[in-house]
C-alpha cells in the first residue's frame, strides 16, 4: 500500500545524495548555458503531481481511455494559454521535447526523401535542422545555409539562391547558437517564391517572443515549434503552434504527434506547461526578459573591453558566442577551466572553426538563468570579468580557486529558490 509519507531519502540514500548534490551545484554555480533555466516551484509542483499516473492517448474530448475529464481540462488550459501567449490559432502541447515537435512538424509537411533548407549546425543551427547524424539529415534531403562571413548574420541571399536551386518543401528558420534577430518576414518572402512551407524553430527565443522583446514569428510562419524550457522557463518539453487558418495542416500536425511519433501524453508535464504559460502572461515576465537582454549586452561589452572577440560583434538576444581562435584556447579547455571555477558554460563551434565539434574554438554563453536568480547589470559585468580572469591564464589554479570562492559568495546572496 502506498503511503503519503514515503520519501526517497529514507528508501534510496544513494539516489537522494545525487539529487541533493545537484541542488547544491545549482545553488553554488553560476549557470551560463544558454539553453538552461530555473523553472518555478509551481511548475515543479505540477510535475510532481498525481497527474503523472494518468494515461490519456488522443486529444481532449477524443481519448482512447476513460477517466480523462480532468486531464482534458488541464490540456485545454495549456492549449488556450499557449495560443494567447503567442497570438496563435492552433497549439499542440503534447510533444515531449523540441526535437519531437520538430519531428512531427516535418512529418506533417514532408515525405521521406523530400528536400528542406535549414541552418548549418556549424553556423548555429540545431541537430534537427539537417545534421547528418540526426533523423532530419537521414530521412530527408537536407540543404544547409549559413552566415555571411563579413557580418556574422544570416546570409539571406544564400538562402534565396538555395531555395531557387533546390525547390524545398520546407524552409526551417531558427537556431541554437545565433545572437542576432532573424528576419521572419524575409524568410516567408523566400518561402512563398518557391511555394515552400516556412517552419520556425523558436526554441531559444520563445520567452523573449512571449514578452514582446523579440520579433514574433507566428504571423509569418506556417508552423512554429519550440521547447517550453530555455527562455520560457517552463518544464522540459515541446510545443507546436500556428497562426495559419489551414485546418488541414492543423490535423496533419496533430496526427504527426499522435499517433505519428508519440503515444500517451505526459499529463503532469502538460500541467507544468499550463502553469508556465500563465506565468509568462504576467507583467513581471516581460520585466524579466528585458533584463535578460540587458545582462547579455553588459557581459558582451565587458568581455570586448577585456580583449575577447564576440561573434557578430554583439548580441540582440539572450546569448552570444565567444571566439577564442585568436587566443589559441580551445572551447573544451575553457569549458573545463570555468567549470572548476563554478561557472557553467558550454563549448561551441564558431564560424569557420578549425577544430572538431568535440573540441571547438568557442563558448556559448547565455543570461536566462543568472537573470532568473536576480542578477542585474552589475552582477553580469562581474561574472564577465571573472570569466576573463580565468581565460587570461586557464592554467593558473590559484586564480581559478580565487574566482570559485567569489562565485560561491555571490551565489549565496542570490539563491535560486529563496
UniProtKB/Swiss-Prot annotation:
Q: State if Signal is listed as a keyword.
A: no
Q: Name one Pfam family in it.
A: SHMT
Q: Top enzyme class of this protein?
A: transferase
Q: Where is this site: Plays an important role in substrate specificity?
A: 229
Gene Ontology BP term (one): glycine biosynthetic process from serine
Q: Which UniProt keywords apply?
A: Amino-acid biosynthesis, Cytoplasm, One-carbon metabolism, Pyridoxal phosphate, Transferase
Report the domain of life of the source organism.
Bacteria
The annotated pathway is: One-carbon metabolism; tetrahydrofolate interconversion; Amino-acid biosynthesis; glycine biosynthesis; glycine from L-serine: step 1/1
Report the leader peptide range.
none
Q: What do we know about how this protein assembles, alone or with others?
A: Homodimer.
Gene (UniProt): glyA
Gene3D superfamilies reported in the protein's UniProt record: Aspartate Aminotransferase, domain 1, Type I PLP-dependent aspartate aminotransferase-like (Major domain)
Tell me which cofactor or cofactors this protein depends on: pyridoxal 5'-phosphate
GO cellular component entries: cytosol
Binding, (6S)-5,6,7,8-tetrahydrofolate? 121, 125-127, 356-358
Q: Which residues carry this modification: N6-(pyridoxal phosphate)lysine?
A: 230
Q: Which organism is it from?
A: Idiomarina loihiensis (strain ATCC BAA-735 / DSM 15497 / L2-TR)
Q: Read off the NCBIfam families from this record.
A: PRK00011.1
State what protein this is by name.
Serine hydroxymethyltransferase
Q: What is its EC number?
A: 2.1.2.1
**A GO molecular-function annotation:** glycine hydroxymethyltransferase activity
Known catalytic reactions? (6R)-5,10-methylene-5,6,7,8-tetrahydrofolate + glycine + H2O = (6S)-5,6,7,8-tetrahydrofolate + L-serine
List the subcellular locations.
Answer: Cytoplasm
What InterPro entries does UniProt report for this protein, alphabetically?
A: PyrdxlP-dep_Trfase, PyrdxlP-dep_Trfase_major, PyrdxlP-dep_Trfase_small, Ser_HO-MeTrfase, Ser_HO-MeTrfase-like, Ser_HO-MeTrfase_PLP_BS, SHMT-like_dom
